[in-house]
């Protein structure tokens, strides 16, 4: 039997329409291959049904953020409580990046604070002694009047 596309001008092709069971079920037609079941359903129901195998993008939005694999956001490093900070090399990496931030944040004309007079002390550079001191009871007279700050003043040794 010859296909409908190969039919000559003198030949008659018969098109038979198969009744649909439900509007959501695509109809399968025989005969003309140019007429798709999607178009038949769309004409009857009015809702376009996508052809299988195609992805339809209904909405586009901007990405939430973009960070290159080589770039590390400094604020995210503060979330390293689960990291083993007893590793001295790792603590030095964080301390070095903190020094770079202090140098770049200083406005023109002002000198950054010298390392000898003021140290920035984020949570990842605290020593075990400082952590143990913080675990003391709040009734401790030394702890009552102090306020924890991100900058700690370095006291020079007292001369006797």
From Swiss-Prot:
Compositionally biased residues, Basic and acidic residues: 127-143
Pfam families to which the protein is assigned, alphabetical: Dysbindin
The organism's place on the tree of life at top rank: Eukaryota
InterPro entries hit by this protein: Dysbindin
Phosphoserine found at: 3, 97, 121
Keyword list, A-Z: Phosphoprotein
Sequence similarity: Belongs to the dysbindin family.
Protein name in the entry: Dysbindin domain-containing protein 1
Species of origin: Rattus norvegicus
């Amino acid at each position: 039997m010859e296909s409908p596309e190969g039919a000559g001008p003198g030949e008659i092709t018969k098109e038979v329409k198969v009744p649909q069971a439900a509007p959501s079920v695509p109809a399968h037609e025989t005969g003309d291959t140019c007429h798709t079941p999607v178009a038949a359903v769309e004409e009857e129901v009015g809702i376009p049904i996508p052809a299988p195998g195609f992805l339809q993008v209904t909405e586009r939005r901007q990405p939430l953020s973009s960070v290159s694999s080589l770039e590390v956001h400094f604020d995210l490093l503060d979330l390293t409580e689960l990291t083993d900070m007893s590793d001295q090399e790792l603590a030095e990496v964080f301390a070095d990046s903190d020094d770079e931030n202090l140098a770049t944040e200083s406005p023109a004309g002002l000198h950054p604070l010298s390392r000898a007079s003021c140290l920035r002390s984020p949570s990842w550079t605290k020593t075990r002694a400082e952590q143990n001191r913080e675990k003391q009871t709040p009734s401790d007279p030394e702890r009552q009047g102090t306020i924890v700050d991100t900058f700690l003043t370095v006291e020079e040794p007292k001369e006797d």
